[in-house]
Amino acid sequence: MRSLLAVTVVVAALAAASPASAAVFFHSPSNNIRCVIQATQLARCDITERDWTPPPKPASCPGDWANGLQVGRHGRGRFTCVTDAVDGGKALPYGESIERGRFRCTSRRAGMRCVNKRTHHGFGLSRQRARRF
């Protein structure tokens, strides 16, 4: 009986989890920019090679500083302070977008652009520049 109950709970949990709420990982066709969208929390992209210089690392950042940008539920895009790295997923072809929850990211030859569709805040990230709005 316990195993039947456990199976029922697992199946119910899987049925309740919709693809729209799951995190989705993807990267630019060049693989220089790697991103994740967590539907209710944030869109974040990390970059491997860049020609721009980030602002000075704040004393409040204990992790790696400005290896990418992110936009959350509120406020404009910001530089990342993290202890992990985004990796995995499939290439998002140039000219295509991916959406999860309130976030949309668009892959362009000029870089990746991610926006919170409700607040219209976000960021643009490329080898040449990092822009927050």
Please identify what each model-predicted range represents:
Residues 17-19:
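N-terminal signal peptide c-region/cleavage motif recognized by signal peptidases
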Residues 27, 74, 120-121:
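Histidine (H) residue identity feature
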Residues 6-15:
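Bacterial N-terminal signal peptides
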Residues 21-28:
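Cleaved targeting-peptide boundary
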Residues 87-122, 127-129:
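Extracytosolic low-complexity repeat regions of secreted or lipid-anchored proteins
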Residues 30-48, 68, 99-117:
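Extracellular/lumenal glycan-associated surfaces
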Residues 42-92, 125-133:
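A low-complexity, Ser/Thr/Gly/Pro-enriched, surface-exposed linker/loop concept
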